[in-house]
Amino acid sequence: KDLLRGATSALSYFPPAQISTVNDREHRCFIDGGVFANNPALSAYAEFRYHNSNLHAKDTMMLSLGTGRKTTNLDCEVTANWGAAEWLYQGSYLTSNAVASASDYQLNAVYDNKPNYLRLDASFDDEQSSSMDNTDKEYLDYLISLGESIVKEKQSEINTFAEELIKTD
């Protein structure tokens, strides 16, 4: 419970989580896991290989579930006038999207582009807020429909992944 609270304590939304070791000798401060790995699938694969060096991507399957991403298209004329605050705000989206995309790209290469690897992630519409603290019913309904649309869009890949998962050799 404490670890999940720490890993999801998004900066400026939730306070950091102070977690004690089992023997209560050390206390650590944990913040949003996305600061380290916005798409932790690649880190999970590396950790898996560390503990299972005899197994390879062809012997495993990975389903990576994203939390959605904001599409950011840069306009050079607009960005030329940005100051530090705007770059800091927009830069956080750019950085998190780039890191998540890079992890997805690398895992596609490791898994040789299917069927053992599948990432589901959706893009927020430009006119929709992607704010984590938006709990308006209209926005929550939008998120549900966004999730349903990504499943519909990727239904074929989901079916192939599921068939591969239950296959017996």
What name fits each language-model region?
Residues 1-169:
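Conserved catalytic cores and adjacent C-terminal regulatory segments
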